Amino acid sequence: MGKIRIEKTYNGRSPDDCYNAAPAALEKAGFEIFKKREIAWLVIGHRSDENGQIQASIGARPPAISATATLSVSCDNLESENLQEYADAVMEQFEKELGV
């Protein structure tokens, strides 16, 4: 099972900003939204392709003016290095949605 975790801090962005950007970012990267947990600032998505089901989630945490967002991407049938393209696609869309 492969897994990638990327954590970044976004100065001037709140956890709410990150949470609000996450659904569009995941969808634009080809993921279907599976679950949203507004109180936890967490959005979970998945997609299926020839490699099986790939899971991705974006979560955020305070402080309010410098939120930290965490992207996790995993798949039972792929190694971590093969998941990098999916993580890169989500991060690119996420940062576009945040306007950074």
State each model region's role.
Residues 1-100:
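Ser/Thr-rich, low-complexity intrinsically disordered terminal regions
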